[in-house]
């Protein structure tokens, strides 16, 4: 564990914003939701409320357990919203191959969650009031300097924009490839306004052809959201803003991401060596 160091960039190149196929449409900055965002009253379906979300592949239980944000379960998304995804046979076949370490690191794509991962929103009546996870800003600065970063949250666009404004400077915001909110999940109008389980299908970010399971990692507090690509998901404990929570989670994520940058195929490495927290981890400066 090395703490935060200056990032090692292949060929010594510095960061330059890129127009990358499939990741070029940044979320508008204004607080209003996009015009095409679903609207309408919040409706609940009794049938969906009673349904249970099926469990994923057995290998997915290797990640650390997460806390529940609410006692009531999420509904299963409707067929119109894509339903519940499963890993494709092609995905699993590639992930099951042996990992290979590269001689030099490369800029991988980090798809970053917000609420529960980097921030905590304690009061829904004050949606623009957030508590930052320890080291959140330092961690994000490092990721932006060392990797390509996209932000994908299941929150509504206006709340996503407020979280990003709190977490990043305007200059850092320009470095983010794309910021996606709830309107980027392809949800039906009813599901958009309901407490439905959402799935971050990484194929959404892979449409341009530059990114794929070999060079992409989703950082999220929900393993279920990464169900379609379980070995491209780094799951960390949900942050609830409590002083009793482990303070040095993000420095350990930082170290794991550094190793992923050396991997020829991220999915193969994560399958074999999933992210695990060290409960007695201490930052080097704290140990001095």
Task: Show which residues each predicted segment covers.
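Eukaryotic intrinsically disordered and solvent-exposed regulatory patches
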Residues: 94-99, 103-106, 133-139, 150, ...
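Short interface patches used for recognition in eukaryotic signaling and trafficking proteins
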Residues: 93-101, 121-131, 144-150, 236-239
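Non-catalytic pre-domain segments flanking phosphatase-related domains
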Residues: 1-112, 125-128
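C-terminal cap/substrate-recognition subdomain and adjoining C-terminal extension
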Residues: 161-288
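Conserved protein kinase catalytic core
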Residues: 119-121, 226-227
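Conserved phosphate-coordination/catalytic loops
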Residues: 89, 130-134, 192-199
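Core residues of folded domains in eukaryotic genome-function proteins
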Residues: 106-117, 139, 145-148, 175, ...
């Amino acid at each position: 564990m090395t703490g935060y160091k200056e990032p090692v960039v292949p060929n010594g190149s510095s960061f330059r914003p890129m127009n990358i196929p499939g990741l070029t449409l940044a979320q508008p900055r204004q607080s209003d939701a996009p015009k095409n965002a679903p609207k309408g009253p919040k409706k609940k379906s009794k049938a969906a409320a009673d349904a249970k979300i099926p469990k994923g592949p057995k290998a997915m239980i290797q990640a650390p357990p997460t806390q529940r944000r609410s006692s009531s379960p999420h509904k299963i998304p409707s067929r119109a919203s894509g339903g519940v995804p499963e890993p494709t046979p092609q995905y699993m076949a590639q992930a099951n191959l042996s990992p290979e370490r590269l001689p030099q690191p490369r800029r991988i794509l980090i798809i970053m969650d917000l609420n529960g991962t980097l921030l905590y929103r304690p009061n829904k009546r004050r949606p623009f009031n957030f508590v930052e996870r320890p080291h959140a800003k330092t961690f994000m600065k490092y990721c932006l300097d060392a990797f390509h970063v996209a932000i994908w949250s299941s929150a509504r666009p206006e709340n996503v924009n407020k979280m990003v404004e709190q977490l990043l400077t305007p200059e850092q915001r320009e470095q983010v490839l794309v910021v996606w909110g709830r309107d980027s999940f392809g949800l039906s109008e009813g599901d958009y306004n309901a407490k439905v389980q959402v799935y971050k299908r990484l194929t959404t970010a892979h449409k341009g052809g530059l990114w794929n399971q070999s060079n992409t990692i989703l950082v999220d507090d929900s393993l279920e959201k990464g169900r379609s690509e379980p070995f491209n998901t780094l799951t960390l404990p949900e942050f609830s803003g409590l002083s009793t929570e482990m303070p040095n989670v993000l420095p350990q994520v930082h170290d794991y991401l550094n190793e992923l940058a050396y991997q020829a195929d991220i999915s193969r490495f994560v399958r074999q060596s999933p992210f695990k927290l060290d409960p007695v981890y201490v930052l080097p400066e704290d140990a001095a």
